[in-house]
């Protein structure tokens, strides 16, 4: 009976007694894929409107086995990156240029949008890609909060100095008549 491959990481599952003289190499390949799935990093250039992360049974050169994926390149149209349709998770750094949208999805499934210049914690159930922090709710931070874009309040309040600490508050005008 020949080797088979695991569905999530494409690890080679050797049959007992198979691969005499080469089982060590095959085992090392499997260990390298496990290492990539836990701590691996790969940079992938987005070249077209639909790109697939490479995947290989038993090999160690596939892109999708890596935990961290940096997407680079210049988008020339709305694009989608796809991985295999299996359960997995990724940290994705969208470092592409161009003003087009970029989605990430399992093959044949539903994409999640990747915000330009942002890092995303993603997981897929094999049919839909999810951005874990997209709907995260309350966020607590220690230190200075810097916002590059607009801050919107939709039905919520804005509380200054909730802990009654001795802090200063300042609003500065940009010179417009209304502030």
Regions found by a protein language model. Name each.
Residues 67, 79, 88, 98-102, ...:
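The right-handed parallel beta-helix/beta-solenoid scaffold, focusing on the short coil/turn
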Residues 31-40, 98-106, 121-136:
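Short, surface-exposed terminal/edge motifs of secreted or surface/virion proteins that either
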Residues 17, 45-52, 107-111, 127-179:
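Intrinsic low-complexity, repeat-rich intrinsically disordered segments enriched
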Residues 2-102:
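Exposed extracellular interaction/assembly regions and N-terminal maturation sites
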Residues 24-29, 116-126, 168:
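Extracellular disulfide-bonded cysteine-rich modules/repeats
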Residues 28, 80, 111-113, 142:
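Short, surface-exposed secondary-structure edge patches
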Residues 103-117:
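Short, surface-exposed beta-strand/turn "edge" patches of beta-sheet domains
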Residues 6-8, 76, 109, 124, ...:
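Residue-level signal for pocket-adjacent positions within structured domains
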């Amino acid at each position: 009976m020949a080797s088979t491959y695991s569905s999530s990481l494409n690890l080679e599952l050797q049959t007992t007694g198979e691969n005499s003289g080469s089982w060590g190499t095959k085992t090392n390949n499997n260990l390298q894929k496990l290492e990539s799935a836990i701590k691996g990093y790969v940079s992938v250039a987005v070249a077209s409107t639909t790109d697939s992360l490479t995947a290989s049974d038993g090999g160690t050169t596939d892109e999708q086995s890596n935990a961290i994926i940096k997407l680079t390149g210049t988008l020339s149209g709305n694009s989608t990156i796809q991985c295999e349709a299996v359960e997995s998770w990724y940290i994705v750094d969208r470092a592409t240029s161009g003003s087009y949208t970029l989605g990430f999805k399992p093959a044949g499934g539903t994409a999640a949008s990747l915000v330009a210049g942002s890092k995303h914690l993603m997981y897929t159930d094999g049919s839909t890609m999810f951005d874990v922090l997209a709907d995260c709710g309350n966020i607590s931070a220690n230190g200075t909060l810097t916002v590059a874009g607009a801050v919107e309040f939709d039905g919520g309040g804005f509380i200054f100095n909730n802990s009654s600490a001795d802090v200063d508050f300042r609003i500065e005008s940009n010179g417009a008549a209304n502030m």
